[in-house]
Amino acid sequence: MSPLPLIHSITNRILNAPKNAAGELFVACNELYKVLLQITGIDLEEAANRQTQTLESGHAIGLTWAAMCIQDYMRTKRFMDGIYQATNDKLKTITGRPVHILYAGTGPFAALILPLTARFNEKQIQFILLEVNEQTFNCLQKMVDTLQLQKYIHRIEKADATKWKLPSNEPVDIFISETMQQALVKEP
């Protein structure tokens, strides 16, 4: 049985929680983290998963650190709320096609867009997912396959978003880039 209904239940709790419900958000984000770790099989202790990848454009954090970002429950809540609201706003103005959402630097879970799959169908939203770290990309692909989210995926690529070129005939309505704290200022 697919874990997607459980993920939808957890992400709905995150979206429905008040912004100041720290305890509730902490519990929900940790539940989501554990489910996604189980799906992807990430070994958080493996040395290779902790390695920062150096690129021409900066640094890409290791798989372990990317996976752990979801545990910052206030940050996760703010991003999920903002993306959900932006999607609702775009759905009011775009007709005849889905809203196209480009998510650059998805991490292993693309966690910030998972709530959208609980609230919208594939005719309403389509994702372009970009991830530069190979181990992280492989986990992302495993998660998409396990949850059977392919119908939502317009494009999924292992790519450096700072160098990636959007084909001229493809629209992007919402662009997601997780701006990280000062310690990650060199992350692309």
Each model region followed by its residue ranges:
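Class I SAM-dependent methyltransferase Rossmann-like catalytic core
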Residues: 52-91
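N-terminal auxiliary segments of SAM/dcSAM-dependent transferases
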Residues: 1-51
